[in-house]
Swiss-Prot record:
Keywords: Glycoprotein, Golgi apparatus, Membrane, Protein transport, Receptor, Repeat, Signal, Transmembrane, Transmembrane helix, Transport. GO terms for cellular component: cytosol; Golgi apparatus; membrane. CDD domains: Sialidase_non-viral. GO terms for biological process: Golgi to endosome transport; Golgi to vacuole transport; protein targeting to vacuole. Functions as a sorting receptor in the Golgi compartment required for the intracellular sorting and delivery of soluble vacuolar proteins, like carboxypeptidase Y (CPY) and proteinase A. Executes multiple rounds of sorting by cycling between the late Golgi and a prevacuolar endosome-like compartment. This is Vacuolar protein sorting/targeting protein 10. It comes from Zygosaccharomyces rouxii (strain ATCC 2623 / CBS 732 / NBRC 1130 / NCYC 568 / NRRL Y-229). Coiled coil: none annotated. Residues 1396-1586 are cytoplasmic. The keyword Lipid biosynthesis does not apply. Disulfide bonds: none annotated. BNR repeats lie at residues 54-64, 401-410, 473-483, 519-529, 841-852, 1123-1133, 1164-1174. It is found in: Golgi apparatus, trans-Golgi network membrane; Prevacuolar compartment membrane. It comes from the Eukaryota.
Length: 1586
């Protein structure tokens, strides 16, 4: 009893002494301190401040300048590999200094470069060789040392060429450095060189890589720019190594044909990233892993690596790779996810940490001392959307902890502290799922203590994270539970292995006390004591002087908060010493307890514990520089946690390892078996696991045939997929999937990983920006608009104007992505309220704010941003619907309808834009329409249809597009449901007058037309025509459709040539040479289930696929086969019996087919551009594949199948991502100087041997080898016109009011006469001249030169009454010509006189030249001039004599011949010159155009010479000259034509072919004799081939 009493007295007295204890604190004042560093296991400190570097050997008690200290030190680092004695300092000029004796002495390292040229250099030391140094220097041409510009120095895989990096190595302690050169560096003027960056292959002393200690890995990168745009770069990255310190270097052979983009060295692995596509800097990347530094294997990842920043890659305690992925977008936002590998490093899985898992930032940290413990900090989109009136992002921050190496995760549980008030938290801390600790993002937890941890954070559900609510928390159980230490944020540090803790508020008034203080605890944070400082300070740093937290000394660096206006803020430096705590008492063995990690659970087959001081013990450990010792107890029983899934298996939602068929065939068991299947154990024991009684795991028989090349990923949805769409960009393969019941899902990798977008409300509509491909808009039912500008990497939340959502689409500005129009309903209690009306609102800041644009507007367009040459860039068109009368008006404005508000058309039905034109439908009469067109927004002109269609009641029309400078237009001529068809028309260049191309083109009830224009190939169009339209028009027969094709933009049409044999090599049941009865017919656009599907690909030049049949007419789809063409539709072949859906990939290098409307368990594919086909079996039950899609550019190697379960109709959907990226071993090689030299070849398309289309020969670059893939190689940039061809009939089309006759010629519409000059000149009074039409006009796309001229390129003629102006316009200006002639005449006269004087007159005159001379000695030749003149005179005399003699001879001969002919044919009379011209040369002129280009050439030249050759019989006088195309119908002129000389009337010609007995006629042939008397002997096949 006495002993107990004495013990109590002693304990009480000891507590009194302890309570009175205060640490020893010293303060010094000096210049601003930037940084303090401590050597490990030492009392030596280094301090960098404004006036240099200082050293302390007594834990900061005293400071001095080190011996040989460099001046101007701006940074000092303790060497991470030699922390006890080595440090590196860097001066402002970039010079490195080294100490190897804890700062006592310093020496400079040799400088490998001129520091003025470089922005930044860093130095690496070798963990095992103290004399090895590696220096990396970054050079940025446009940035200077110390620049404030921010750059991402670590992200070398981005291929951003603004900065270059160079590496230098030393093996003699830094006495000299050698630059490491790449073995494949080939600089050129168009190369953006990224430089060489290197790393030692030994990462640390813990490295398990068996590679040489001298081995250095390096990366050399460059970008070659080929064309003047942002997308035609070829990136080149090389991985090489040196093992002799830069004397030689060798490329890693495994990557010599690949494009390396980055590499990283870890303790157990080396990672190498390669670009899948060297022509796309945002390309998907592949990860290669090596565990020995030499042999690399391709890793399998659950997602696509694309433009990733992998900074922070590390390994956990099991050697597994932790791969945080950060995707940076255009607006500097990031998205991230964390991948973790298995122990091999080859199979990764996504670390599922949050329900949303759509993180903006994520950090994963593994503890070095707490085995199995990992922390994760995550930021994701806020779960419940909030909008505070400003355009900020709301983030949801979550903190997680795991005690079993990431197998399971939990929130950080908060427990109540008896020292703090109960209402401290706004949520129930017992509900840990919704009320937990969320630590400050990125705050690293110290782990040098035995489970005693501190952090800053907030308590809640993570949706509200603010500095205002930040508190300081402490844990004594390794993070399982946390309690509040301080209700405000503090800096903190540990000493004596956690038995001494110092904390200091960031601000002195945090505790409502303006004076500064720090707090300390001697019982592991249970109680705290305050130490008041003399002056108020702002602490900048609080550290323990021993990095392992074993010491008892601390340092505080701070700024003074008291100063006058003239004195700059002072700097205070405090040292704190706890050596005298508990009177120096050292803890005995009884004062310790065993603390078990993970609550005593087995971790990797063992229980781990530390021995630590009991919390209330009145002593300190005082074991300076001694690290914690971990105790291990082996566990007997093994559990599933001791195992990981084998390669090729992954855990399902129940934690069971199931086969993952994507990587399974690459498992070691499958690779060794060589068979179609192998037995594989689903689980394997974790490396280093020590549990004794292993689980009995039965092997499973798994297939090994699937997946060797094609990888398949399956996702299941418990709801019908009702919408899916890709973003049309090269950056990634992002798509949005909208389900009927489960909301919206987002995938960035073509559906491999699908994440639900959950803003806390239903999404009712999704709209993609049609002009800016990274933008999309998701409408919430509450009135919020979720805007993404980076393909769903992040969202901004906008508040829509307070109105009812009407479901009208957004209208976008073509040039400004932040400007768009939203339509909302005002005064709408419900949609049928009389006062409910639409209002158009406009935003110009991406949805941050909206302003009212116009009442009652239901459709607006930013017209000024659409046209090539707009009348005003700010022009807006709006369709306004008056609420009462329901009248619709087209209005325009150039100032957002503030002051400028014009009525363009009083009454319209609607309008649309085609990209180049705006077309408005205007009501006309009863149930009739008229079309008005504008090309610049200045004026809408009525579209003039051919005269034979003006009587047609225009009840409906469809605008089909305007890609080639003309509007294609379908005018419905019969619209009875089920019997619809109409005329296909094509406009002139301004869209105001149309010519008819076909009369009965098929359409359906919804206005869709069987019209398909092939992208990337000029002028190729497919249509379906109603062959029996006369009977369909009377509803006596169903439609009989025939397919037709044109290769010259609609001028000539032909039936599609059928293949000679089917896919089974059998002949068809008709003669394929008779196209009228036996041609290929394809189902068209009107039958497409998805209007986005096309028969072609814009990137697969010449490739077409369609469902159809060979015969006289198109058959139902279930009786059809699937056909394929590689030459733009000229020839076809059957590839599959039955109807299939299709999709192109890799520019046509990969084609995938899936059965249509039938159950299937396989797909069919071709990897040789349609030459051969193979099948691939889908695992599982058969499904209905509803659609197959890929990125809009058809350049990817991944396809997405949308399928529905066969057992559930419409209720359950699954997706399959089919990945062909492993099919090809390499990417095709493309040399810009000789693009057709290696894997590519030029191909030409065309219907004849000349290969001419649109007047030129054009070549397309296409893949020629099938063992490589194209990627985003800029093939379209190499498309070239090799030459322009001579014009032929195929380069012309019929002019306005002309139609093509059966013989192929263009004739006037029946009942019309050619327009006279009054028709043209009267309509446009300002005209002075006009041109005579021929009925033809040149196709706008044609570039032909010379050859046939059918388009009326004749001499201009004057308008009536404008003869004077015409002569002035074309008359010759006499004065310039007169003076020119006068000067020439005078010069000639002088020369002639000189020759006459010196050569004729002086030698006796002209008479002397007629004499017979014996010699020429008597000619006067005193000099060379005389000789030359005499020679000229003699030559002229001889030439004149020869001409005169020839004339005399010819005259005699002609006279004799005429006399003989008159004798022989005296009784025959010949035609006059007039009759010869008109009858014999021009009879049957149109015959010359039918199928004979040579004859057409003759006719063209004749037209060019003759002008007019048609004569009216009735009035015996020449008609007015015909004008070219006009917007008015060509009617008979009522004006009196100018009189012309009459001719004799004649009888019309009866025969189309002159004979010997035909009577000659002196009159020209009649106007339309072709239609009546000419027989065309060429069939339509010939016409189509012209």
């Amino acid at each position: 009893m006495l002993i107990r009493l004495l013990f109590c007295i002693w304990a009480f007295w000891f507590k009194v002494i302890a309570a009175e204890f205060q640490p020893k604190v010293t303060r010094t004042s000096d210049s601003t301190v930037f940084y303090v560093a401590a050597f490990d296991d030492s009392t030596t400190l280094l301090r960098v401040q404004e006036n240099g570097m200082f050293i302390s050997f007594d834990n900061g008690g005293t400071w001095q300048e080190p011996n040989g200290a460099p001046s101007g030190v701006m940074m000092v680092d303790i060497d991470e590999h030699h922390r006890h004695d080595r440090a590196v300092a860097q001066t402002k000029d970039g010079q490195f200094y080294l100490t190897e004796d804890q700062g006592k002495h310093w020496r400079s390292l040799a400088s490998p470069i001129d520091s003025k040229e470089y922005l930044y250099c860093d130095l690496d030391t070798h963990p095992l060789r103290r004399d090895y140094f590696l220096v990396r220097c970054t050079k940025c041409p446009e940035m200077e040392m110390g620049s404030s510009q921010l750059i991402d120095l670590h992200k070398r895989d981005s291929f951003m060429p603004s900065c270059q990096e160079f590496s230098y190595v030393s093996n003699n302690g830094g006495k000299d450095f050698k630059k490491i050169e790449s073995p494949k560096h080939e600089p050129s003027p168009d190369t953006e060189y990224l430089g060489v960056t290197c790393e030692f292959a030994s990462k640390s002393v813990e490295s398990t890589l068996p590679s040489s200690r001298d081995l250095i890995y390096c990366f050399d990168g460059k970008m070659d720019k080929w064309f003047d745009n942002d997308f035609t770069f070829q990136t080149s990255g090389v991985l090489f190594y040196t093992d002799d310190f830069g004397k030689s270097s060798k490329v890693v052979d495994q990557f010599k044909d690949l494009t390396v983009s980055n590499f990283e060295v870890l303790n157990s692995h080396i990672l190498v990233y390669t670009l899948e596509d060297r022509f796309n800097r945002w390309s998907a990347s592949n990860l290669w892993v090596s565990s020995d530094g030499f042999k690399f294997s391709k890793a399998f990842l659950p997602t696509i690596l694309r433009d990733m920043d992998t900074y922070g890659t590390t390994e956990d305690g099991l050697g597994r790779i932790i791969l945080p992925l950060y995707v940076e977008s255009e607006d500097d936002n990031r998205a991230s996810q964390i991948l973790i590998s298995d122990s091999s490093g080859l199979q990764f899985r996504v670390l599922e940490l949050t329900p949303e898992d759509n993180m903006e930032f994520s950090i994963l940290e593994a503890s070095k001392t707490l085995k199995g413990t990992m922390w994760a900090d995550l930021m994701s989109l806020v779960k419940g959307p909030r909008y505070s009136g400003h355009p900020s992002f709301d983030f949801h921050q979550v903190s997680k902890i795991s005690f079993d190496y990431g197998s399971t995760w939990s929130n950080l549980k908060v427990v109540a502290s008896p020292n703090h008030r109960k209402d401290l938290f706004t949520c129930d801390i017992n509900d840990v799922d919704h009320c937990s600790l969320h630590k400050l993002f990125g705050d690293s937890l110290p782990t040098e203590t035995a489970g005693i941890l501190m952090t800053l954070g907030t308590v809640g559900d993570g949706s509200e994270n603010s500095w205002e609510n930040l508190m300081t928390f402490i844990s004594r159980d390794g993070g399982k539970t946390w309690e509040v230490a301080f209700e405000y944020p503090c800096q903190f540090a540990f000493g004596d292995l956690g038995n001494v803790i110092v904390a200091m508020p960031f601000s002195p008034d945090e505790d409502s006390d303006p004076q500064s203080e720090f707090y300390y605890s001697l019982d592991q944070g249970k109680t705290w004591k305050e130490y008041q400082l003399e002056v108020p300070i702002m602490p900048t740093e609080l550290i323990s002087t021993t990095p392992d937290s074993s010491g008892l000394n601390f340092i505080i660096s701070s700024f003074s908060l008291t100063r006058d206006n003239e004195t700059p803020p002072g700097s205070f430096f405090y040292t704190i010493d706890f050596s005298d705590a508990f009177n120096g008492e050292v803890c005995g063995p009884k004062e310790f307890e065993s603390w078990y990690l993970a609550g005593g659970e087995c971790v990797n087959g063992a229980k781990y514990s530390y021995s630590r001081r009991k919390q209330n013990s009145q002593c300190l450990v005082r074991k300076l520089f001694e690290d914690l010792v971990l105790t291990e107890e082996i566990c007997d029983e093994c559990t599933d946690k001791d195992y990981e899934c084998s390669f090729g298996f992954s855990r399902d939602s129940n934690g069971v390892c199931k086969p993952d068929f994507k990587p399974l065939s690459f498992s070691p068991e499958c690779m060794k078996s060589g068979k179609d299947s192998a037995k594989v154990k689903p689980m394997t024991k974790l490396p280093g696991n020590k549990c004794r009684k292993e689980l009995k795991i039965e092997p499973l028989e798994v297939p090994c045939t699937q997946g060797h090349t094609i990888l398949l990923t399956e996702n299941n949805f418990n709801s019908k997929i009702q919408m899916y769409q890709y973003f049309d960009t090269k950056q990634d393969e992002t798509l949005i999937i909208d389900t009927a019941r489960n909301g919206v899902y987002i995938s960035h990798d073509s559906g491999q990983i699908v994440k639900r977008f959950d803003p806390g409300e239903n999404i009712v509509e999704i709209v993609f920006n049609t002009y800016h491909n990274s933008y999309a808009y998701l409408f919430g039912e509450s009135g919020k608009l979720y805007v993404t500008a980076n393909r769903c990497q992040s969202f901004a939340i906008a508040e829509l104007p307070h109105s009812r959502q009407l479901g009208l689409p957004l209208e976008f500005h073509a040039k400004d992505p932040n400007t768009f129009i939203y339509y909302g309903g005002k005064n709408c209690k419900d949609m049928f309220s009389p006062s409910c009306h639409p209002v158009a609102y406009i935003t110009t800041d991406g949805g941050k704010s909206f302003t009212k644009l116009l009442d009652n507007a239901i459709h607006c367009e930013f017209a000024g941003s659409l046209f090539k040459h707009p009348v005003d860039e700010n022009l807006i068109y709006c369709q306004v619907k008056e609420p009462q009368t329901r009248k619709r008006t087209l209005m325009s404005s150039t100032d957002l309808f503030r002051n400028d508000k014009k009525v363009v058309l009083e009454k319209i039905i609607g309008y649309m834009n085609t990209g180049e034109f705006i077309v408005a439908a205007v009501p006309y009469g009863e149930n009739e329409l008229r079309a008005y067109v504008t090309v610049d927004g200045a004026e809408l002109a009525e579209a003039k249809f051919p005269q034979d269609l003006t009587a047609t009641k225009q009840e409906a029309f469809t605008v089909l597009g305007s890609e080639t400078g003309s509007v294609f237009f379908h005018l419905t001529t019969f619209d009875e449901p089920g019997y619809e068809y109409g005329a296909l028309l094509k406009s002139n260049s301004n869209g105001t007058s149309f010519v008819r191309l076909q009369s009965a083109v098929n359409r359906n009830l919804f206005g869709m037309v069987d019209f398909e224009k092939v992208q990337a190939l000029e002028g190729i169009i497919l249509i379906n025509v109603v062959d029996n339209f006369e009977k369909v028009g009377t509803k006596t027969e169903e439609k009989k459709l025939k397919s037709m094709i044109t290769f010259n933009d609609g001028s000539d049409w032909s039936y599609i040539r059928a293949p000679p044999k089917d896919s089974d090599s059998n002949s068809y049941g008709c003669n394929t040479k008779q196209l009228e009865k036996c041609s290929l017919h394809l189902h068209g656009y009107t039958e497409r289930e998805d209007v986005r599907d096309t028969s072609f690909s814009g990137s697969a030049f010449g490739m077409l696929i369609g469902i159809g049949n060979v015969g006289e007419y198109l058959l139902p789809e279930d009786q059809c086969s699937t056909f394929f063409s590689r030459d733009g539709g000229e020839t076809w072949r059957e590839i599959k019996k039955g109807a299939y859906q299709w999709e192109f990939g890799d520019h046509g290098g990969v084609i995938v087919l899936v059965p249509k409307n039938s159950l299937t368990d396989r797909i069919f594919y071709s990897i040789d551009m349609g030459e051969t086909w193979s099948d691939y079996i889908l695992q599982g039950a058969k499904v209905y594949i509803q659609d197959i899609v890929t990125v809009p550019g058809d350049s990817a190697l991944r396809f997405l199948l949308i399928a529905s379960s066969s057992s559930v109709t419409g209720g359950s959907t699954k997706t399959f991502t089919v990945d062909f990226s492993n099919v090809f071993e390499r990417q095709c090689s493309l040399n810009p100087d000789r693009p057709d030299n290696e894997d590519f070849k030029f191909f030409s398309l065309g219907q004849s041997d000349s290969k001419c289309l649109f007047g030129h020969q054009e070549r397309y670059l296409m893949k020629d080898n099938y063992d490589c893939f194209v990627g985003n190689a800029p093939l379209s940039e190499f498309r070239e016109i090799t030459k322009n061809c001579s014009c032929t009939r195929a380069d012309f089309e019929c002019d306005y009011n002309y139609v093509k006759a059966r013989d192929g010629t263009c004739t006037l519409v029946e009942g019309l006469s050619p327009a006279g000059p009054s028709d043209i000149c009267k309509k446009q009074p300002e005209l002075i001249e006009y041109f005579q039409p021929t009925g033809y006009r040149k196709i706008p796309l044609s570039t032909c030169v010379g050859g046939l001229t059918l388009d009326g390129v004749l001499s201009p003629l004057p308008c009536p009454g404008k003869e004077k102006e015409f002569k002035e316009l074309h008359g010759v200006k006499s004065a310039p010509y007169f003076f020119t002639f006068l000067v020439f005449f005078l010069v000639l006269l002088v020369i002639a006189w000189f020759v006459y004087d010196r050569g004729v007159r002086r030698n006796g005159g002209f008479a002397r030249f007629g004499e017979i001379r014996l010699d020429g000695d008597d000619l006067i030749e005193n000099n060379n001039t005389d000789k030359m003149v005499n020679s000229i005179v003699k030559s002229g005399f001889y030439a004149a004599s020869a001409i005169f003699s020839s004339y005399q001879l010819l005259k005699r001969s002609m006279g004799r011949a005429v006399w003989k002919l008159s004798e022989k044919f005296g009784r025959r009379s010949g035609p006059t010159y007039s009759s010869l011209l008109h009858d014999q040369f021009l009879d049957e002129a149109d015959d010359l155009l039918t199928g004979h280009d040579e004859d057409a050439n003759d006719l063209g030249s004749f037209l060019a010479e003759q002008g007019n050759f048609e004569i009216e019989d009735e009035d015996n006088e020449l008609p007015p000259l015909r004008a070219p195309f006009t917007d008015e119908p060509h009617m008979e002129s009522t004006e009196t034509a100018e009189p012309v000389e009459p001719v004799e009337p004649v009888e019309p010609v009866e025969s189309a072919e002159p004979t010997e007995t035909a009577e000659p006629s002196s009159s020209p042939p009649q106007e339309n004799y072709n239609d009546e008397h000419h027989d065309n002997k060429d069939d339509e096949q010939d016409l189509g081939a012209q």
